UniProtKB/Swiss-Prot annotation:
PROSITE patterns attached to this UniProt entry: TREHALASE_1, TREHALASE_2
Subcellular localization(s) per the UniProt record: Cytoplasm
Keyword hit for Phosphoprotein: no
Pathway: Glycan degradation; trehalose degradation; D-glucose from alpha,alpha-trehalose: step 1/1
Keyword DNA-binding: no
Family: Belongs to the glycosyl hydrolase 37 family.
EC numbers, comma separated: 3.2.1.28
Keyword set, alphabetical order: Cytoplasm, Glycosidase, Hydrolase
Residues of the active site: 326, 509
Record-level Gene Ontology MF annotations: alpha,alpha-trehalase activity
Protein name: Cytoplasmic trehalase
Length: 549
């Protein structure tokens, strides 16, 4: 595999002058206002109330004290702690005692907060179990119940049971859940599928979108919009009829397209960019421009090394988290430096393919319900998006989709995200055939397909392979008649996961698949996680299609 390096660029190229939200952000949450008037909680009968305050907003200088001193090795630990009493009383106590000579921050936190539990860590796998048996027995371990919610915690209560990925992740995640659902369906767990369907619909109804995850600190962003794919899965498996979700799909679409009507050429607002020819495409975005609660110290340190206004860096870090690819060379100006992140300046191929699927789903379900005007409107929207993607994101010279840098008006890097248009049926057969050749030569390994061909130390780059990318590549190529490539990726991935399982008796978040024996994937802001929701889901589905490896 060719080893590629990316060259840094001068800071003169990186100015932002047309993004409506960089100078003034009407959606920015004001901390002083939030302290004076907390949002009304969303009530679920029989459960403690949730509210929208993040731990950073709620605990203010106490939060910064804990995070800046690295009291816990993982920055996510304190945001996930639950208070033992009214948070305002905790903050008042902290302000009274913090300057005392004998003040002990660790003891104070331990006396006033419940530390998060990692229930799945107590599970011991049976080495005699097959891979299929292991996954089926993990579903109850990864299931959380509504009554698990603790008052004033950052966890957002949900009305039904849900699946968490495992490891440090004790909440459900939006796009992870779709790939987890594939395995639940294969395992015959329609009960959990129904619960998760109800939960995601409930979040759209109450928050206007599906958050990154069910934590207050995730409310300001979403993740790749895969609810339309979930609805399709519910329909196919007889769990829930697609018609009941039409309004939810429209609400999600409104979230992603907010502000589109008022944009002039070459302007952006939140998730939407008006291209030079007047077409509309989308980018990842977060309504906040502060350090992430769950990675506070890491974000502060990254911003220090950027040479840019910290709020711009924080926004791009948050938008990178919204992409699900946190982090990757896809979002970096200089592939060796996370501080060069520019997520909001890229038009991602995967996001726009998922939105094409959303537009198509709204059109199709509207047709089923006899809503002809809505059907025609959204068929046109889908057609317009496909045309814009082909114009800006299809690299005809090299035969692949690429992200587009709308600031510089040039194509960005090639990655495994390019297979999403095939998965949602947006490509034509010539594009699919040409893309297959590129994937074979640049991403395919004996262990599966890599996220990218660039070695940066980030987790969504070479040498790592991820379950959702394998699934979309397998099904995408098979949809266009390339069964040989789809089957090869499937067998390679099953071999990778099974080899690791036979040695360690667990499934993990990502795998090192570039050369040699498959092993744990590296990179990222946190240690490798096991469990693992979407790996379990994809592998379980593949076992149903191909049998045990």
């Amino acid at each position: 595999m060719l080893h590629q390096k990316l060259n840094p660029t001068s800071s003169e190229d990186l100015t932002i002058d047309v993004d409506l939200l960089y100078e003034t952000d009407p959606c920015e949450l004001k901390l002083d206002e939030m302290i004076e008037a907390e949002p009304e909680p969303e009530m679920i009968e029989g459960l403690p109330a949730s509210d929208a305050l993040t731990p950073a907003d709620r605990y203010l200088e106490l939060f910064e004290h804990v995070q800046s001193t690295k009291l816990f090795p993982d920055s996510k630990t304190f945001p996930d702690c639950a208070p033992k009493m009214d948070p305002l009383d905790i903050l008042i106590r902290y302000r009274k005692v913090r300057r005392h000579r004998d003040f002990d921050l660790r003891r104070f936190v331990e006396n006033h907060f419940w530390l998060p539990e990692t229930l799945s860590s107590e599970y011991v796998s049976n080495p005699e179990n097959s891979l299929k048996e292991h996954i089926d027995q993990l579903w109850p371990i990864l299931t959380r119940e509504p009554q698990d919610h603790i008052p004033w915690s950052s966890l957002l209560a949900l009305p039904q049971s849900y699946i968490v990925p495992g490891g440090r992740f004790s909440e459900t995640y939006y796009w992870d859940s779709y790939f987890t659902m594939l395995g639940l369906a294969e395992s015959g767990r329609e009960d959990l599928l129904k619960c998760m369907a109800d939960n995601f619909a409930w979040m759209i109804e109450n928050y206007g979108h599906i958050p990154n995850g069910n934590r207050t600190y995730y409310l300001s962003r979403s993740q790749p919009p895969v609810f339309a794919l979930m609805v399709e899965l519910f329909e196919e498996d007889g769990v829930r009829g697609a018609r009941r979700y039409l309004d939810h799909l429209k609400m999600e679409y409104a979230f992603w397209m907010d502000g589109a009507e008022s944009l002039a050429l070459n302007q952006a607002y939140r998730h939407v960019v008006r291209m030079p020819d007047g077409s509309l495409l989308n980018r990842y975005w977060d309504d906040r421009d502060t350090p992430r609660d769950e990675s506070w110290l890491e974000d502060v340190e990254t911003a220090k090394h950027s040479g840019r206004p910290p709020n711009e860096v924080y926004r791009d870090l948050r938008a990178g988290a919204a992409s699900g690819w946190d982090y990757s060379s896809r979002w970096l100006r200089d592939a060796g430096r996370l501080a060069s992140i520019r997520t909001t300046q890229f038009i991602p191929i995967d996001l726009n393919a998922f939105l094409y699927k959303l537009e198509s789903a709204i059109a199709n379900i509207s047709a089923l319900k006899g809503e002809r005007d809505t059907e025609a409107l959204f068929r046109q929207k889908a057609s317009d998006r496909r045309a814009a993607v082909n114009h800006y994101l299809w690299d005809d010279e090299n035969g692949c989709y690429r992200d587009y840098d709308w600031r510089r008006e040039e194509m960005a890097l090639f990655s495994a995200a390019s297979i999403v248009p095939l998965y949602v049926g947006m490509a034509n057969h010539e594009q699919a055939d040409r893309l297959a050749n590129v994937v074979r030569s640049r991403l395919l390994t004996p262990g599966g397909i890599m996220a990218t061909e660039y070695e940066t130390g980030e987790q969504w780059d070479k040498p790592n392979g991820w379950a959702p990318l394998q699934w979309m590549a397998i099904q995408g190529f098979k949809l266009y008649g390339d069964d040989m490539l789809g089957d090869e990726i499937a067998h390679n991935w099953l071999k990778t996961v099974n080899h690791f399982y036979q040695e360690h008796h667990k499934l993990i978040e990502k795998y090192h698949i570039s050369g040699g024996t498959p092993r744990e994937g590296g990179g990222g802001e946190y240690p490798l996680q096991d469990g693992f929701g979407w790996t379990n889901g994809v592998v379980r589905r593949l076992i149903g299609l191909y049998g045990e490896p």
